[in-house]
Amino acid sequence: MNPRRKNRLILVMLVLVGLGLATALVMYALRSNIDLFYTPSEMVNGKGEQQLKPEPGQRLRVGGMVMPGSVKRDPNTLRVAFKLYDASGVISVSYDGILPDLFREGQGVVAQGVLQDATHVIAKEVLAKHDEKYTPPEIEDAMKKDHPAQAVGDNSVRPS
């Protein structure tokens, strides 16, 4: 092999190794920013055909309805515990902070946080549904899959 060809080969190999390393570093950095969405039934029964369940310590978002009678507030702190439910699953959520004004029992919410065990999420953020006609697309799709005969919500914006 002549020296010129050998130098080109070394250069190409170094570029490929550099690109591979850069890709690996980007994927590693983005790994911590991925929050998967689950419904309570997907957390209990598994998601998809493989029935994959989230693992403790995993960051995730879970959406469902606040179970009536399940909201427990600590009178001395901002700590709140409540249960989320859907068609076939119930999970508990604990949150330390100020809840949105629209948060109430029977209301749809999305809690973002870390899974402590199979059915308990420690939420870092709680989002409440902001309009009775609006349902987040992820929740609407999940509810349509669980209840295909029922109309869940309408994402369209209607003039007042």
Curated annotation (Swiss-Prot):
SUPFAM superfamilies: Heme chaperone CcmE (SSF82093). Its main location: membrane. InterPro entries: CcmE, CcmE-like_sf, NA-bd_OB-fold. The lineage of its organism: Bacteria, Pseudomonadati, Pseudomonadota, Gammaproteobacteria, Enterobacterales. Belongs to the CcmE/CycJ family. It is a single-pass type II membrane protein. It is found in: Cell inner membrane. The chain crosses the membrane at residues 9-29. This is Cytochrome c-type biogenesis protein CcmE. Keywords: Cell inner membrane, Cell membrane, Cytochrome c-type biogenesis, Heme, Iron, Membrane, Metal-binding, Signal-anchor, Transmembrane, Transmembrane helix. It comes from Erwinia tasmaniensis (strain DSM 17950 / CFBP 7177 / CIP 109463 / NCPPB 4357 / Et1/99). Residues 30-160 are periplasmic. One of its GO terms (molecular function) is heme binding. Residues 133-148 have a biased composition (Basic and acidic residues). Residues 133-160 are annotated as: Disordered. The gene is ccmE. Gene3D superfamilies: Nucleic acid-binding proteins. Heme chaperone required for the biogenesis of c-type cytochromes. Transiently binds heme delivered by CcmC and transfers the heme to apo-cytochromes in a process facilitated by CcmF and CcmH. One of its GO terms (cellular component) is plasma membrane. It holds the Pfam family CcmE. Residues 1-8 are cytoplasmic. Heme binds at residues 130, 134. The keyword NADP does not apply. One of its GO terms (biological process) is cytochrome complex assembly.
